[in-house]
Amino acid sequence: MATYSFRQTTSSVAGGPCGRSLRLGGGSFRAPSIHGGSGGRGVSVSSARFVSSGLGSGLGGGYGGAFSSSFSAGFGGGYGGGLGSGDGLLSGNEKTTMQNLNDRLASYLDKVRALEEANSDLETKIREWYLKQGPGPARDYSPYYKAIEDLRDQILAATIDNSKVVLQIDNARLAADDFKTKFETEQALRMSVEADINGLRRVLDELTLARTDLELQIENLKEELAYLKKNHEEEMSALGGQVASQVSVEVDSAPGIDLSKILADMRDQYEHMAEKNRKDAEAWFHSKTEELNRELAVNTEQLQSSKSEVTDLRRTLQGLEIELQSQLSMKGALESTLADTEGRYGAQLAQIQDMIGSIEAQLAELRADMERQNSEYKMLMDIKTRLEQEIATYRQLLEGQESQLFGSLSGSPDKRDKPADGK
């Protein structure tokens, strides 16, 4: 006679597929179920072991695939211990055995239903666990994005302002270079004008010397003319005395040369020559004087215009120097403002980059946590699927063995009645 025992065992599963064995006849029949605590990481798997002992061949199988079976002289093992060749299918307390078998079958079906309920409970707990352990609600980074956009706009505006300042500095530098070029040109022109003025001064000095020389020559000519007049008068007086002393001689002698006429002619000739020389000297003197006066007037006008130009150039130079100093001071102020702005916005940009780095680190951590939870969820779903397959396999096996058992039980009385009829 076969004996049956049923005991409950519990094993803990952390993850991954695990093997289960099913044996009928001197073996064990294990139907697992899964349950998990709320919020926990581990999953407990409880299995019900159905142990039978008896004679006959065993039905062996493994979880996850095929299972082999062999029968010898009836169904022996899982549900019976005397179901072989011999004196019939059942002997002794047949009703007790069948009742025990039916009770065991009902208990197993209850266990199957309990496993299904545990499976549904497990699915509920998995969903709850996923909701608890899953990623929380997405954080609202829109204020940070708005602040970043505002800072970017400020940086862009500051960059544009800096570009404008740099452009103004470049324009001021170009204007200063232009003014410097103009100043150098005007300075060269001033030096040229001063050189011309110095040359005109030398010419004026030369003309003054020439005028002085001419005046000296005129004075010398006047003195020479006075000396000639004096000599002429002396000669005339001497000749007059000679003529008076020779009157008597001339009376007696033959008529000679008319000396008075000769002297008058000589006087006229000398006076004409002197007048001509005087007029020529006066004309030359007047022409030279007028020429010198004209040159002096022209040079004076040029000197006055050059002085006015030099004054204007000095005034322009002073204005340019003042403007250059103001531009240099403005450039220094703008450069200091640019440095302060770059430092301030650089610090703000560094803070924003640090904030972005921390947010990216948090996002990476959240992604890693989500991937880990997703892998755990997939593992649990795989365990659930395998358990469902195992339950379905057990159910099919139970239904097949039950049909074979009842077929054997229904066919055995016919076999036992035939020898009786033969007798």
Curated annotation (Swiss-Prot):
Q: Which of UniProt's keywords are assigned here?
A: Coiled coil, Intermediate filament, Keratin, Phosphoprotein
In this entry, which stretches build a coiled coil? none
Q: Which Gene Ontology BP annotations are present?
A: epithelial cell differentiation; intermediate filament organization
User: Which stretches does the entry tag as region Coil 2?
Assistant: 263-401
Its recorded name reads Keratin, type I cytoskeletal 19
Q: Which gene encodes it?
A: KRT19
Extra facts: There are two types of cytoskeletal and microfibrillar keratin: I (acidic; 40-55 kDa) and II (neutral to basic; 56-70 kDa).
Map out region (Disordered) in residue numbers: 403-423
What segment(s) does the record annotate as region Linker 1?
130-147
- Residues with the modification Phosphoserine, per the entry, are 33
Region of interest (Necessary for interaction with PNN), ranges? 258-415
Question: Anything noted about its domains?
Answer: This keratin differs from all other IF proteins in lacking the C-terminal tail domain.
- Asked if the keyword Oxidoreductase belongs to this entry, the reply reads no
- Identify the GO cellular component terms for this protein: cytoskeleton; intermediate filament
Coil 1B, as annotated region: 148-239
Subunit info here reads:
Heterotetramer of two type I and two type II keratins. Interacts with PNN and the actin-binding domain of DMD.
- Region spans: Head: 1-93
Question: SMART domains from the entry?
Answer: Filament
Record's compositionally biased regions (Basic and acidic residues): 413-423
Segment Coil 1A: which positions?
Answer: 94-129
Tell me the function of this protein.
Involved in the organization of myofibers. Together with KRT8, helps to link the contractile apparatus to dystrophin at the costameres of striated muscle.
